[in-house]
Design a protein with these regions (language model features):
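N-terminal basic/disordered segments at the start of proteins
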Residues: 2-48
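Broad gene-expression machinery/nucleic-acid interaction feature
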Residues: 9, 22-24, 91, 133, ...
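Long, charge-dense
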Residues: 104-144
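Phosphate/diphosphate-binding glycine-rich loops and adjacent basic-rich segments that engage nucleotide
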Residues: 136-193
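Conserved small/polar residues in nucleotide/adenosyl-binding loops
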Residues: 212-219
Length: 222
């Protein structure tokens, strides 16, 4: 991993529909200067407001990550951000003409492929890195989800999910090198259970979802 900041060589666009809104949307990745980070630009709104992908702007994590700044929202951004982090891209301006990125096939692979096609460019500025010095734990009491960050000399992310269903059981995955993200993780797709579909539709969600986009496993063996 280089210690220099990176961006992309050229702009590149993807088009599709938002998984929850069902609206047509165009997203364009653009090169950005050092220390820009990940910034979304709502080109469909007056003034084309910017929303930085920072934790302080996260207002909802149910069925996706939602950012909000000055009343402007952006939903379901996690696959876009996963592609950027997985390819170790530090700076990019993301123009979008709707409140939700295109879902593509339900994974981050289309974004990874587009970013690689645009090409990566090293910038003449050093990366700013966080060093974890103490154990940090956060638990969401409502969902039961928990995350723990532990000081280490090596990079490793381990995730475990258990939906209390026979069809999926308990599943684990680990990532120790970001260079493995493209081949081993970028094809991972969002999904929902069949018993959830009616509830999601009643809540005005998954309007842009097709079965080939978001698999819906049964939560039993029958």
């Amino acid at each position: 991993m280089t210690n220099k900041q990176t961006t992309i060589n050229s702009s590149i666009s993807l088009e599709g529909v938002g998984i929850h809104t069902g609206k047509d949307v165009k997203l364009t990745f653009n090169p950005a200067k050092p220390d820009t980070g990940y910034v979304f630009k709502r080109v469909d709104l007056e003034g084309q407001p910017l929303i930085e992908a920072l934790s302080k702007y996260v207002v909802n994590t149910q069925r996706g990550t939602t950012l909000e700044k000055s009343g402007v929202k952006l939903k379901t951004i996690e696959h876009v951000l996963a592609a950027l982090v997985g390819l170790e891209i530090d700076n990019v301006l993301i123009e979008i003409n709707a409140e939700e990125p295109p879902i593509m096939d339900g994974s981050s692979r289309f974004f990874v492929d587009a970013l690689e096609k645009a090409g990566l460019k090293e910038l003449n500025s050093l990366r700013k890195e966080y060093v974890i010095k103490n154990i940090i734990t956060y638990k969401d009491e409502k969902s039961g989800s928990e995350i723990t960050v532990i000081p280490s000399e090596t990079y490793q992310i381990t995730a475990m999910v258990d939906y209390d269903t026979k069809v999926l059981g308990t599943q684990n995955a680990s990532l120790s090198k970001l260079s493995d993200f493209k081949d081993n993780f970028s094809n991972a797709r969002t999904f929902s259970f069949l018993h959830e579909i009616e509830m999601l539709l009643e809540n005005n969600l998954i309007k842009g979802c097709l079965l080939y986009t978001s698999p819906s496993p049964r939560d039993s063996d029958t």
